[in-house]
Amino acid sequence: FFLADEQMLEILSQSKEPRAVQPHLGKCFEGLNTIKFEKDLKITQMISPEGERVDLTTPIDPESGPNKGNVEKWLLELEGLQWVSVRRQVELALQDYPKQKRIDWCIKWPAQAILAVSQIFWTQKTEEAIDAGGHQGLDKYVLDLNQGLTDIVMLVRGQLSKLQRKTLSALVVMDIHSRDTNVTMVTGLIEKCSDFQWQSQMRYYWGPAWKDGQAVKKGEGTVVARIVNARCLYGYEYLGNSMRLVVTPLTDRCYRTMISAIDLLYGGAPEGPAGTGKTETVKDLSKAISIQCVVFNCSDQLDYKAMAKFFKGLAGCGSWCCFDEFNRISVEVLSVVAQQ
């Protein structure tokens, strides 16, 4: 649904040559640039545009059984294994975190696992600090956060690969926001975890899934994001090693509104002057909960059939869509879109 007809034809017409799919992977999966084929054509790794490699939990054989000559079947298998593999990396990184120094841990795992697990432990330690001594307990934890930030900054200044530097840059952005959030709560004299100052923040927990989620069986451990009364399952879409937005109070407010809307099965429409980061904020929120976000530029030439095709794709794969310049769509098409 998100590929042009020419691209679909090219993929399907070369079904006997699995490697011919490589140029189109970026359109199907946001964080994938290529996949690694072994000599026997088995697929063993996902490779991001930045060059990060993540092992698949089990190899995919496009040349065996029902997969042979059916590119659509092994691509579906790749989609499912992508979720399972990312979840496995997050789970292993979570178990490994308490066993070694953070500066050693954060250059060992894929960027996505590092950011998710760091946020889980920040949530856990912040709640422990508040329970232990309210704003005074939290003030002590802020000192630990500052020390952790200093260690990461020293690491960034050292000898690192381009990939590791990018991962740590994203981690520093997240850590600074976590530290600033805690400083604000100390200033606000927070006393318990149920205070709105803490409940209004994006919090990450590792807990049982309350419904069948992607790559998660009911009751298994998974990452759950919470903000105020809303909660959503982490999507495990592989996003590669991408940079994250610097979070401001307005970004936080937008996150609260959007997640609450999605929890109530609504959509959201950020509004404001051009170039202020509306689209990027929505994209960054999708990265925060690891869900694919497709950006679609609207125009007055768009008809209801094209929109219907897009909605089918969104419903089929569970991804988000950001309709840029939505106001350009003609009223006649908008009325049909509202019905759809």
Each PLM stretch: what is its role?
Residues F1-L32:
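Amphipathic alpha-helical packing elements
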Residues Q22-P249:
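Extended, charged/polar low-complexity intrinsically disordered regions
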Residues R244-V247, C293-D303, R328-V331:
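Flexible beta-alpha connector loops of hexameric P-loop NTPases
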Residues V246-M258:
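N-terminal pre-P-loop "Q-motif" helix
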Residues C254, L264-G268, C317-S319:
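Pre-Walker A (Motif I) flank of P-loop NTPase domains
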Residues M258, T279, M307, F311, ...:
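Conserved RecA-like P-loop NTPase ATPase core
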Residues D263-F296, F310-G313:
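Walker A/P-loop
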Residues S319-Q340:
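Conserved AAA+/SF3 P-loop NTPase catalytic/coupling segment centered on the Walker-B
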